[in-house]
């Protein structure tokens, strides 16, 4: 199957909501070694985001059940084994993506926009690994995630408009990383607020094609700020999970 056919099959799989098939097609496109077009890049991202998202969601549900079955040994053991199975799947998916990023995508990125997109993706998939990691391995994974986000952030500040959806999406996810992985609500809030304020100040630079994407991410930044501010003020409510891109 040539590259065009693989891309067409990936689009078909997306419409059928068969994201594992979609990811497999886009993995093969990536492994051909050329730089991906914007469309191909987005297809790859959507495919793996759905594939990993299903496991992240399952992992959270099963972890919660496992915590609630304390005292019921048999049930807890079954929950633990199932959680570990989901974790193994999640790790395999993340390592798949990280391999593609390191071997092909980051090295082949000729434009700052692509470089930021892929470094953000690298930060994201290390963050997903960090969510299920423990012990000594976790510290290294967290450091890898932070470095990728920071590298992307530095490029985005000099090469992209504050209203660019990729720059905004990066700020959103980097702030979620600070809040949920590093437990630094102040840093998370200041990063999200700065990104939101800088974008608001330059709303007139918003291009028509990215208007919808940019304003949606700005809304998520604002929602997270509202949620996190109430959390840090000792809200009685259970800590909310931040929206991400």
From Swiss-Prot:
Q: Does the keyword Cytoplasm apply?
A: yes
Keyword Oxidoreductase attached: no
Identify the SUPFAM superfamilies for this entry.
14-3-3 protein
User: What is the protein's name according to its record?
Assistant: 14-3-3 protein zeta
- What is said about its interaction partners and assembly? Homodimer.
Superkingdom of origin: Eukaryota
Q: Keyword annotations for this protein?
A: Cytoplasm
Q: Which GO terms describe its cellular component?
A: cytoplasm
InterPro entries the UniProt entry points to = 14-3-3 (IPR000308), 14-3-3_CS (IPR023409), 14-3-3_dom_sf (IPR036815), 14-3-3_domain (IPR023410)
Briefly state the protein's biological role.
Adapter protein implicated in the regulation of a large spectrum of both general and specialized signaling pathways. Binds to a large number of partners, usually by recognition of a phosphoserine or phosphothreonine motif. Binding generally results in the modulation of the activity of the binding partner.
The UniProt entry lists the main location of this chain as: cytoplasm
Gene that this polypeptide is encoded by: ywhaz
One example of the protein's molecular function in GO is: protein sequestering activity
**GO BP terms:** regulation of ERK1 and ERK2 cascade
Residue numbers marked as site, Interaction with phosphoserine on interacting protein: 56, 127
Supply the Gene3D superfamilies for this chain: 14-3-3 domain
Whose protein is this, by species?
Answer: Xenopus tropicalis (Western clawed frog)
| Stored Pfam families | 14-3-3
């Amino acid at each position: 199957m040539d590259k065009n056919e693989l891309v067409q099959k990936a689009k078909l799989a997306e419409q059928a909501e068969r994201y594992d098939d979609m990811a497999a097609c886009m993995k093969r496109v990536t492994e051909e070694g050329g730089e991906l077009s914007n469309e191909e890049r987005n297809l790859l991202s959507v495919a793996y985001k759905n594939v990993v998202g299903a496991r992240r969601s399952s992992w959270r549900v099963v972890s919660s059940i496992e915590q609630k079955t304390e005292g019921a040994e048999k049930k807890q053991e079954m929950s633990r084994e199932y959680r570990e199975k989901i974790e193994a799947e999640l790790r395999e998916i993340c390592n798949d993506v990280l391999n593609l990023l390191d071997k092909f995508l980051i090295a082949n990125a000729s434009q700052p926009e692509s470089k930021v997109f892929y470094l953000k993706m690298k930060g994201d998939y290390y963050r997903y690994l960090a969510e299920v990691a423990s012990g000594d391995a976790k510290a290294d994974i967290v450091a890898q995630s932070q470095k990728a986000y920071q590298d992307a952030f530095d490029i985005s500040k000099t090469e992209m408009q504050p209203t660019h959806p990729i720059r905004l999406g990066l700020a959103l996810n980097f702030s979620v990383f600070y809040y949920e992985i590093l437990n630094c609500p102040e840093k998370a809030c200041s990063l999200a607020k700065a990104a939101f304020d800088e974008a608001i100040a330059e709303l007139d630079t918003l291009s028509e094609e990215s208007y919808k994407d940019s304003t949606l991410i700005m809304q998520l930044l604002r929602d997270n700020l509202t949620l996190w501010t109430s959390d840090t003020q000792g809200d009685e409510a259970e800590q909310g999970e931040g929206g991400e891109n």
